[in-house]
Protein backbone atom coordinates (compact mmCIF):
# COMPACT_ATOMS: atom_id res chain seq x y z
CA UNK A 1 0.00 0.00 0.00
CA UNK A 2 1.49 3.35 -1.00
CA UNK A 3 0.15 6.51 0.63
CA UNK A 4 0.59 9.66 -1.43
CA UNK A 5 -1.27 12.63 -2.80
CA UNK A 6 -1.18 15.97 -1.16
CA UNK A 7 0.78 15.39 2.04
CA UNK A 8 -0.12 12.18 3.93
CA UNK A 9 1.65 13.39 7.09
CA UNK A 10 -1.03 16.08 7.50
CA UNK A 11 -3.43 13.29 8.50
CA UNK A 12 -3.12 12.83 12.26
CA UNK A 13 -4.32 9.22 11.97
CA UNK A 14 -1.51 8.27 9.57
CA UNK A 15 0.81 6.61 12.12
CA UNK A 16 -2.07 4.50 13.44
CA UNK A 17 -3.23 3.58 9.92
CA UNK A 18 0.26 2.52 8.84
CA UNK A 19 0.75 0.40 11.98
CA UNK A 20 -2.57 -1.33 11.40
CA UNK A 21 -1.71 -2.06 7.76
CA UNK A 22 1.70 -3.41 8.78
CA UNK A 23 0.12 -5.62 11.47
CA UNK A 24 -2.23 -7.04 8.81
CA UNK A 25 0.78 -8.05 6.74
CA UNK A 26 0.84 -5.27 4.16
CA UNK A 27 4.00 -3.58 2.97
CA UNK A 28 3.49 0.16 3.44
CA UNK A 29 5.13 3.03 1.58
CA UNK A 30 4.50 6.72 2.07
CA UNK A 31 5.52 9.58 -0.22
CA UNK A 32 6.09 12.90 1.53
CA UNK A 33 7.02 16.41 0.47
CA UNK A 34 9.69 16.45 3.17
CA UNK A 35 8.49 19.42 5.21
CA UNK A 36 6.89 17.40 8.03
CA UNK A 37 8.54 15.03 10.52
CA UNK A 38 8.53 11.34 9.55
CA UNK A 39 9.57 10.26 13.09
CA UNK A 40 6.02 9.32 14.23
CA UNK A 41 5.87 6.60 11.56
CA UNK A 42 6.74 2.98 12.28
CA UNK A 43 10.29 2.25 11.06
CA UNK A 44 8.87 -0.52 8.84
CA UNK A 45 7.14 2.07 6.62
CA UNK A 46 9.10 2.74 3.42
CA UNK A 47 9.63 6.49 3.09
CA UNK A 48 9.87 8.24 -0.28
CA UNK A 49 11.14 11.71 0.63
CA UNK A 50 10.84 14.50 -1.94
CA UNK A 51 13.61 16.95 -1.07
CA UNK A 52 12.81 20.35 -2.57
CA UNK A 53 15.49 21.90 -4.81
CA UNK A 54 16.15 25.65 -5.19
CA UNK A 55 14.30 25.75 -8.52
CA UNK A 56 11.08 24.76 -6.75
CA UNK A 57 11.16 27.91 -4.63
CA UNK A 58 10.34 25.66 -1.66
CA UNK A 59 13.76 24.50 -0.45
CA UNK A 60 13.33 26.43 2.81
CA UNK A 61 10.56 23.99 3.74
CA UNK A 62 12.86 20.95 3.78
CA UNK A 63 12.98 19.33 7.21
CA UNK A 64 16.61 18.22 7.14
CA UNK A 65 16.26 15.99 10.21
CA UNK A 66 14.22 13.61 8.04
CA UNK A 67 17.38 12.65 6.14
CA UNK A 68 18.88 11.18 9.31
CA UNK A 69 15.86 8.89 9.65
CA UNK A 70 16.18 7.37 6.17
CA UNK A 71 17.13 3.71 5.94
CA UNK A 72 18.27 1.38 3.14
CA UNK A 73 14.71 0.57 2.02
CA UNK A 74 13.77 4.26 1.72
CA UNK A 75 14.23 6.62 -1.22
CA UNK A 76 14.99 10.30 -1.57
CA UNK A 77 13.83 12.12 -4.69
CA UNK A 78 15.12 15.33 -6.23
CA UNK A 79 12.96 16.98 -8.92
CA UNK A 80 15.35 19.11 -10.96
CA UNK A 81 14.49 22.18 -13.03
CA UNK A 82 17.98 23.01 -14.29
CA UNK A 83 21.74 22.54 -13.91
CA UNK A 84 21.76 24.60 -10.72
CA UNK A 85 19.31 22.17 -9.12
CA UNK A 86 21.45 19.26 -10.30
CA UNK A 87 24.61 20.72 -8.73
CA UNK A 88 22.70 21.45 -5.51
CA UNK A 89 21.38 17.86 -5.41
CA UNK A 90 24.88 16.45 -6.01
CA UNK A 91 26.22 18.48 -3.10
CA UNK A 92 23.39 17.33 -0.79
CA UNK A 93 23.88 13.71 -1.88
CA UNK A 94 27.60 13.89 -1.09
CA UNK A 95 27.26 15.86 2.17
CA UNK A 96 24.73 13.44 3.63
CA UNK A 97 26.16 10.21 2.17
CA UNK A 98 22.80 9.51 0.55
CA UNK A 99 24.05 6.93 -1.96
CA UNK A 100 25.16 4.79 0.98
CA UNK A 101 22.05 5.52 3.07
CA UNK A 102 19.08 4.96 0.73
CA UNK A 103 17.89 4.93 -2.87
CA UNK A 104 18.47 8.23 -4.70
CA UNK A 105 16.21 9.33 -7.56
CA UNK A 106 16.71 12.30 -9.88
CA UNK A 107 13.73 13.43 -11.92
CA UNK A 108 13.64 16.23 -14.52
CA UNK A 109 10.83 18.78 -14.32
CA UNK A 110 8.73 17.98 -17.39
CA UNK A 111 9.07 20.69 -20.02
CA UNK A 112 11.92 22.47 -18.21
CA UNK A 113 14.86 20.05 -18.10
CA UNK A 114 15.36 17.48 -20.82
CA UNK A 115 15.77 13.90 -19.59
CA UNK A 116 18.69 13.55 -21.99
CA UNK A 117 20.58 16.45 -20.39
CA UNK A 118 20.04 15.02 -16.93
CA UNK A 119 21.14 11.55 -18.06
CA UNK A 120 24.29 13.00 -19.64
CA UNK A 121 25.18 14.93 -16.48
CA UNK A 122 24.70 11.82 -14.37
CA UNK A 123 26.82 9.70 -16.73
CA UNK A 124 29.57 12.32 -16.97
CA UNK A 125 29.73 12.52 -13.17
CA UNK A 126 29.34 8.74 -12.69
CA UNK A 127 26.53 9.58 -10.27
CA UNK A 128 25.09 6.25 -9.12
CA UNK A 129 21.57 7.58 -8.64
CA UNK A 130 18.53 6.49 -10.65
CA UNK A 131 16.93 8.64 -13.34
CA UNK A 132 13.19 8.75 -12.74
CA UNK A 133 10.70 9.99 -15.29
CA UNK A 134 7.14 11.06 -14.58
CA UNK A 135 6.06 8.85 -17.46
CA UNK A 136 2.38 9.84 -17.29
CA UNK A 137 3.39 13.36 -18.35
CA UNK A 138 4.84 11.95 -21.57
CA UNK A 139 1.83 9.75 -22.33
CA UNK A 140 -1.19 11.96 -21.55
CA UNK A 141 -1.74 15.65 -22.35
CA UNK A 142 -0.70 18.21 -19.69
CA UNK A 143 -3.30 18.71 -16.99
CA UNK A 144 -4.90 15.28 -17.41
CA UNK A 145 -6.25 14.22 -14.02
CA UNK A 146 -6.47 10.73 -12.59
CA UNK A 147 -3.43 9.27 -14.35
Task: Give short role names for the model-derived ranges.
Residues 1-5:
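Short Fe-S-cluster ligation motifs
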Residues 9-147:
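Conserved AdoMet/S-adenosylmethionine-binding subsite of the radical SAM
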